[in-house]
Amino acid sequence: MPASSYFLLFFFMNFFSPAQSYLLTHCEPVNETVSVEKDGCPKCLAFQTSICSGHCFTKEPVYKSPFSSIYQHVCTYRDVRYETIRLPDCRPGVDPHVTYPVALSCECSLCTMDTSDCTIESLNPDFCMTQKEFILDY
């Protein structure tokens, strides 16, 4: 292969890959429909809130050593406010209140199990196992 072909290949790999990454949404708060449900409450409540979503730049090493850890950054909460919602028709003795985080700002950092779903594939945020009710203006 001629040297000019290597140059062109290198040029296109480095020129177009970063350009395409600008098309991805950066990590930021977005409005999303989420659902909450609880044992002892027959209905699932769906409502709009702010969650963290978007792309974080990461580097995957070509050689993975069994002696080194790989830490991938994910889009997660930086600043949150907590709000409480009341589930309808809960059985007597069941606390109908559920507290959830509202994203005020987001960052690319390690996944924190306290505030984020750190699984590879998870359910959609509006998934319900019981009958769903919507709150339109919350």
Curated annotation (Swiss-Prot):
Lineage top rank: taxon: Eukaryota
Subunit structure: Heterodimer of an alpha and a beta chain.
Disulfide bonds: 27-75, 41-90, 44-128, 52-106, 56-108, 111-118
InterPro entries: Cystine-knot_cytokine (IPR029034), Glyco_hormone_CN (IPR006208), Gonadotropin_bsu (IPR001545), Gonadotropin_bsu_CS (IPR018245)
Record's keyword annotation contains Secreted: yes
Localization in the cell: Secreted
GO cellular component: cytoplasm; extracellular space
Record Pfam families: Cys_knot
Leader peptide range in chain numbering: 1-21
MF-aspect GO terms: follicle-stimulating hormone receptor binding; hormone activity; lutropin-choriogonadotropic hormone receptor binding; protein heterodimerization activity
Protein name per the record: Gonadotropin subunit beta-2
Species, as recorded: Clarias gariepinus (North African catfish)
Classification via PANTHER family: GLYCOPROTEIN HORMONE BETA CHAIN, LUTROPIN SUBUNIT BETA
Any one GO biological process: positive regulation of androgen secretion
Family, as annotated: Belongs to the glycoprotein hormones subunit beta family.
Residues glycosylated per entry: 31
CDD domains: GHB_like
Primary localisation category: secreted
Its job: Involved in gametogenesis and steroidogenesis.
